[in-house]
Amino acid sequence: MRLILLGAPGAGKGTQAAFICQKFGIPQISTGDMLRAAVKAGTPLGLQAKAVMDAGQLVSDDLIINLVKERIAEPDCAQGFLFDGFPRTIPQADAMKAAGVKLDYVLEIDVPFDAIIERMSGRRSHPASGRTYHVKFNPPKVEGKDDVTGEPLVQREDDKEETVKKRLQVYSDQTRPLVDYYSSWAKTDPANAPKYRAIQGTGSVEEITQRALTALSS
């Protein structure tokens, strides 16, 4: 099972990725983890990436693709892999295709943006304990206070509505076009293209997982 998981920030990709990886016995690969591992291992590509990052520059798509090819050749990828948050752009997708990276599925978790904004901007946390709440879906007993200590809850910077909207805009501009890229490739070249599947990402975690498994068996 070789797949790409697509979806906006806050669509619940992380939860579903963990379940899919466990179910199929495959590793979850993100470019961040991959870069850190290559740098730590001191591989030639890792050293190249480190030099670029130390200079405060972005790692090129070519280097990322070479790291991807190196990573998926490792023994734990024998049964497949799940790419989370990669590719992010059309040039990266083109580079993957040109490099001959074979994929079985592209699975999109589709959640309306207003639902994501409500989901993320409603989160509150108690930093000292790590307890989390949601103003609508899992509210504290007393508004704005931790259930156990009564201390004030905070909203993380990442969860502020303005920040969420900015991240969704970046997703719309850069990554959302991949949905059209993979769905049209699947229609025009079904023999070589990965199967493109989209599922609704609203409802309970169990419902979404069931939709994902059904999509990946069709």
Swiss-Prot record:
EC class of the enzyme, as a word: transferase
Region (LID): 122-159
Residues engaged in binding AMP: 31, 36, 57-59, 85-88, 92, 156, 167
GO terms of molecular function: adenylate kinase activity; ATP binding
Keywords in alphabetical order: ATP-binding, Cytoplasm, Kinase, Nucleotide biosynthesis, Nucleotide-binding, Transferase
EC number(s) recorded for this UniProt protein: 2.7.4.3
Domain of life the protein comes from: Bacteria
Region (Disordered): 127-150
Cellular component GO terms, alphabetical: cytoplasm
GO BP term, pick one: AMP salvage
Location in or out of the cell: Cytoplasm
CDD domains: ADK (cd01428)
Pathway(s) where this gene product acts: Purine metabolism; AMP biosynthesis via salvage pathway; AMP from ADP: step 1/1
Residue numbers spanned by region NMP: 30-59
Gene3D superfamilies: P-loop containing nucleotide triphosphate hydrolases
NCBIfam families: adk, PRK00279.1-1, PRK00279.1-2, PRK00279.1-3, PRK14527.1
Family in the record: Belongs to the adenylate kinase family.
Record's function text: Catalyzes the reversible transfer of the terminal phosphate group between ATP and AMP. Plays an important role in cellular energy homeostasis and in adenine nucleotide metabolism.
Name the record gives this protein: Adenylate kinase
Gene name of this polypeptide: adk
